[in-house]
Amino acid sequence: MKPKRLRLALAAAATAGLFLAPAAGGGSAEFDPLLDGAPLCAAPAGGPPALLRHLVLAAAETAPFQPAPPRPALGEAPVLYANLGTLSFKAGTRNARAQAWFDQGIRLAFAFNHAEAQRAFREAQKEDPRCALCFWGEALVLGPNINVPMLPEASGPALAALAKAVELEASAPARDRFLIEALAKRYSADPKAERAALDAAYADAMAAVAQRYPGDDTILTLYAEAMMDTQPWDYWEAGGAKPKGRGAAIVATLEQVLERNPRHPGAIHLYIHAVEASTQPGKALPYANRLPALMPGAGHLVHMPAHIYYRVGMYRESLAINKRAMAADEAYFRTSPSDPLYKAAYYPHNIHFLMVSAQMGGDGTAAIAAAAKLDAAMPAEVVAQFAIMQPVKAAPYTTHAQFAAPDAILALPAPPANLALVAALHRYARAVAFAQKKDVAAARAEIEAIARIGRDADWKPFAEWGVPAKEIVETARVVATGRLADATGDLDGAAKAYEDAIFIEDSLPYTEPPYWYYPVRQSLGAVRLRQGRLDEAEQAFRESLARVRNNGWALAGLAATYKRKGDAPAARATQRAYAAAWFGDAKGPALDRL
């Protein structure tokens, strides 16, 4: 056995040990933990994924929010919204308007609309120029967060706002003074100061504030966020079972808040991020369900349950919530000039999530419509400047490969050649289309074009952003090879290609949505089923479901496998799970499209 195939076999065997193996003699119980809501048996590869984080950073660098110029640069006068919930944090002011603007700033800060939050804090300062915490709030939102490191142009305004807060703190309540003093640890006038050390110092200072005020839910939430900013998107060791760094303290702090206040929107938002890459993302589900109603005007918070819905296999709910998030953002854009960063990154993220949720549930119509909207939201000239944007720009081609007719795929316009990853996925879609048409020569030409891109493109810009672009391209090449072999009846060749693709897919780091659009194990299972190798088909489908819950494509294949095996109880249980998960074409997926 070749080393790569051996490693794949060992990985499969290790995974198989984590869930129920087929019963001896082919029997199977009605209850199956893969079909009935058990924790995930396998988490994605560890490490910081940061797809949204880097997408946001790229948008920030493309059109950064400029806080330093005079107030008109912030746009029209902000609106005091009535649809951002009721979270309140006393700001040491007797001015009701100042408190209202301050509360809006805090709400928007927890919703990651930091530029709009700054506008609110500035309005609070206008209403009460002696409100120390109103200046603290502005300094807070100009700092780093889990999606964006602190931008150089924000340093001056942050220090200025902090200095004003310090100037006013003598007359502020004690709690406010402690918060201001803690935030002072986060910033330095020295441009050479190490950001990681400043972030750690701030987190440590917030730990002391949290110890002084253990009953203050917002302070504990701010403390948790300070810890998260020291290791953004990297809270779990590989496998997702063991917390990493401050990960255990982050989770414990947020759970302490949510146990007594399960409606704190900031704590829910951060808790979703804290556990989504773990083996138990479902722990956040009850809170995620509440979040959209708590701040219905904050599109990003309306979207956030999708991070859990997708991980636990609730694709129908993920699709629906992202529609609501898009509507909330579009309403917000009509009333505010908006930060270009928010509009160019967070809003397309909602569209992307909607698209992949529709893909997983089999809703080709919704997926293709979202693909068009996503493509339009990401201009090629902007994407060309930032490699991190290319996986998202390329994603619509995978939607067409999955659902569109071959001729429709072949009619798609080619992307600019300088978008290497996008071009490779365009070639992938074309290879799939030609394979379906059984045009072997044309499919091989497209596969060779993918290989050529993999060999010749400059992948360094992608590596700098942490994007495994070369691995994505190689996955595309190998899957396309499998599709062609499958279409021409070479099932052994197809199985080998899919096994090779699985090996690469398993190495891709965690991000939501995933870097590769579907679990390739379902394709391997479909081939083994058509070969009559039923135990291997069952294993492939079950391994797929252990990684990607409630995947209707894999459930359809597994149900067909049990039917072929004569295992009626297992077939019934799987068919029920499939019926609940699938919301696409009533005929269901064809085996050769898995």
PLM features: residue spans?
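Generic long, charged, amphipathic alpha-helical segments
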Residues: A476, A495-L545
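TPR/Sel1-like alpha-solenoid repeat signature
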Residues: F135, Y309, I321, A485, ...
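N-terminal alpha-helical interaction modules that lie
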Residues: G26-Y271, E276-A284, N289-M295, V312-L319, ...
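C-terminal non-catalytic interaction modules
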Residues: Q539-L594
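Canonical tetratricopeptide repeat
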Residues: G137, L222, L270-Y271, M304, ...
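Gram-negative bacterial Sec-dependent N-terminal signal peptides
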Residues: K4-P22
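Histidine-centered active-site/metal-ligand motif
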Residues: F110, H264, H269, H273, ...
